[in-house]
Amino acid sequence: MEIVDHIGSIELLKLEKTAFLCSRKIPAGIVLKCYDWAISQREMGKCIISGFHSKIEKDVLHYLLKGQQPIIIALARGLKQHLEPELEAELKKGRLLIITPFEKHVKRITAETADIRNRLMIDLAENITAGFISKEGNLEKLLSQSNKDIIKIG
């Protein structure tokens, strides 16, 4: 797995990184625990890498962006033409890196591209935190193949 394209400070890859992954369907009671986790990571200045694609991952990104710690967004598609203004501002501060294992012509996110992106994040991260892992879901299968320790929030 390799990074094909990026925007932002590639130097962030040298930092210790925690990958945040979460099944798309998550029990309501675990959502707040994920928010608390994001706030604690922000307060400790930890570098988090995630796809920030699902609803819960976007919420985690929202909490992380309120801090000053480094953030790495891993896309399951090629780089976008235009970024959201809040991401542009963080790129200028040097605290954000957006990476992708895909060329620009890959425009749609599929289960396959998400799996490739998730494998890249797991390869790059020293630590893995899972918000929630659905039984027999894609994330459970993927994480069972990793030899890294996995911290489970819920």
What does each model-found stretch correspond to?
Residues 1-154:
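Glycine-biased, small-residue-rich flexible motifs in mid-sequence functional cores and linkers
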